[in-house]
């Protein structure tokens, strides 16, 4: 495996003025990125605890990542937009020696020695630093939601990141020195899919500002000014952008490669994208945070769209061996699997196994292997029981999306005394709803040919678009709040 830091340094030596990272009006060259990260690494040297990387979209967040990797301590990205109580939970769990605060604000909850951007800019530390990271070191820890309300810190090994990056570069058909688009916040592991493959291939990492997440017109302005080649995002963010009629190959001929991860890619959205960008390479990928971003991929073509009404997630990559339990739960084994949850042995033991030096992870996803392809069939914990019938909400959503009247759909269970009493469908219709009763009848008639009566939502709520979280995923919690009043 080729060391990422060595690749970055070699490219910086050969192309010092090439732009490495860009965010709105701020940018850093490769030489600046490597120099500034070396100055930070000198300050972190010898630390045995991960550095807290605090902030939001900015070039200096990348400086923080590379600096922490060089120092060998790794980093924990913490987004400023999350609640203060959650920040405190993460800080208490990590107990950091060092914090790199890339914002202009000060936060009482930050513990340890705090560095700012200005500290690094004005530092007299040397701009040369020999990377200390080892293959078995933890390179980053990303906190995800926990069922108990306490976030879980997923620890990823450096060798796993290097292997993932090499796989991404093998998939990449656009070549080196490309303009990459990253939509995801740094606290969401989808960002890893853009950051390291981009920089390891001498590309420019273009960061989508957080204000653009629910405003496709602002993104349109960005795409007009920068010839983006490679787009990395969630399917939901891309679907929102497809509301722009100008998002097509004729207007943006430089856009020739798409990578999607983080959620299921709806057939209708993929069909629209293939139609608008017929010459582009489009990848659907799948993977949990606990297995280094993504473990499968498939190139979406018209042939694949014609063959599969529900899209597969493809075949496994190096470092990931997939299988299912008797209950249909997907299990991942190999180098891609996380080292477990930071300081949480109980939760780690529940889903990870490290026997005989082989790492395995039970995903909680239902899956099947058919015709040489893997298919994700929803979450085990998205199962509900209604009138004695056990059912998958995502199965109902998939069938709703097959209807000619439905563009997007989420199914929300309605509870009374902790019991599901009926279902409501949150629907983005394909046309304006002028007659509520007629549209409801049409959709229910469509469902009756594919689902038993007990799985059909009692009623539907019409929405212009489904709200997204800051990560660019569909915000199920917000939809439920809107529906339940």
UniProtKB/Swiss-Prot annotation:
Signal peptide: none
EC number: 6.2.1.54
Superkingdom classification of source: Bacteria
Keywords: ATP-binding, Cytoplasm, Ligase, Nucleotide-binding
Database matches in CDD domains: DltA
GO molecular function, one term: D-alanine [D-alanyl carrier protein] ligase activity
UniProt key word Amino-acid biosynthesis: no
Residues where D-alanine binds: 189, 293, 473
Metabolic or biological pathway, per its Swiss-Prot or TrEMBL entry: Cell wall biogenesis; lipoteichoic acid biosynthesis
Function of the protein: Catalyzes the first step in the D-alanylation of lipoteichoic acid (LTA), the activation of D-alanine and its transfer onto the D-alanyl carrier protein (Dcp) DltC. In an ATP-dependent two-step reaction, forms a high energy D-alanyl-AMP intermediate, followed by transfer of the D-alanyl residue as a thiol ester to the phosphopantheinyl prosthetic group of the Dcp. D-alanylation of LTA plays an important role in modulating the properties of the cell wall in Gram-positive bacteria, influencing the net charge of the cell wall.
This protein's name: D-alanine--D-alanyl carrier protein ligase
Organism: Staphylococcus aureus (strain bovine RF122 / ET3-1)
Gene expressing this chain: dltA
């Amino acid at each position: 495996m080729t060391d990422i830091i060595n690749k970055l340094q070699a490219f910086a030596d050969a192309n010092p003025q090439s732009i490495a990272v860009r965010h709105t009006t701020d940018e850093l060259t490769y030489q600046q990125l490597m120099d500034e990260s070396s100055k930070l690494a000198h300050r972190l040297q010898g630390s045995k605890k991960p550095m807290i990387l605090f902030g939001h979209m900015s070039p200096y967040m990348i400086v923080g990542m590379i600096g922490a990797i060089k120092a060998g301590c790794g980093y924990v990205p913490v987004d400023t937009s999350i609640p203060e109580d959650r920040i405190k939970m993460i800080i208490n769990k990590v107990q950091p020696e060092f914090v790199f605060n890339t914002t202009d604000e000060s936060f009482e909850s930050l513990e340890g020695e705090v560095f700012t951007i200005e500290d690094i800019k004005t530092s007299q530390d040397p701009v040369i630093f020999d990377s200390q990271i080892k293959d078995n070191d933890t390179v980053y820890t990303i906190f995800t939601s926990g069922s108990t309300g306490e976030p879980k810190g997923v620890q990823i090994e450096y060798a796993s990141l290097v292997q993932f990056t090499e796989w991404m570069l093998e998939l990449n058909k656009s070549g080196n020195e490309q303009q990459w688009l990253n939509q995801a916040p740094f606290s969401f592991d989808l960002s890893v899919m853009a950051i390291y493959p981009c920089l390891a291939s001498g590309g420019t990492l273009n960061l989508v500002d957080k204000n653009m997440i629910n405003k496709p017109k602002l993104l349109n302005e960005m795409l007009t000014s920068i010839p983006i080649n490679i787009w990395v995002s969630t399917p939901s963010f891309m679907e929102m952008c497809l509301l722009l009629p100008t998002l097509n190959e004729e207007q943006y001929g430089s856009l020739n490669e798409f990578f999607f991860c983080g959620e299921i890619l709806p057939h209708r959205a993929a069909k629209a994208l293939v139609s608008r960008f017929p010459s582009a390479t489009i990848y659907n990928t799948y993977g949990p945070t606990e297995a280094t971003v993504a473990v499968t991929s498939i190139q979406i073509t018209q042939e694949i769209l014609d063959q599969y009404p529900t899209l597969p997630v493809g075949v496994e990559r190096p470092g990931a061996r997939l299988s299912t339990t008797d209950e249909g739960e997907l299990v991942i084994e190999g180098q891609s699997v996380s080292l477990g949850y930071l300081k949480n042995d109980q939760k780690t033991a529940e889903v990870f196994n490290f026997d005989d030096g082989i790492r395995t992870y039970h995903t909680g996803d239902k899956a099947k292997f058919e015709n040489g392809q893997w298919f994700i069939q929803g979450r085990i914990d998205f199962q509900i029981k209604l009138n004695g019938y056990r059912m998958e909400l995502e199965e109902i959503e998939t069938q709703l999306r097959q209807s000619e009247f439905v563009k997007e759909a989420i199914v929300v269970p309605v509870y009374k005394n902790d019991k599901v009493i009926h279902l409501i469908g949150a629907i983005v219709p394909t046309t304006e709803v002028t007659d509520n009763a007629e549209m409801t009848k049409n959709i229910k008639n469509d469902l009756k040919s594919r689902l038993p009566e007990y799985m059909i939502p009692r009623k539907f709520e019409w929405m212009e678009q489904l709200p997204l979280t800051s990560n660019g995923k569909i915000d199920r919690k917000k939809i439920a709040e809107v529906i339940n009043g």
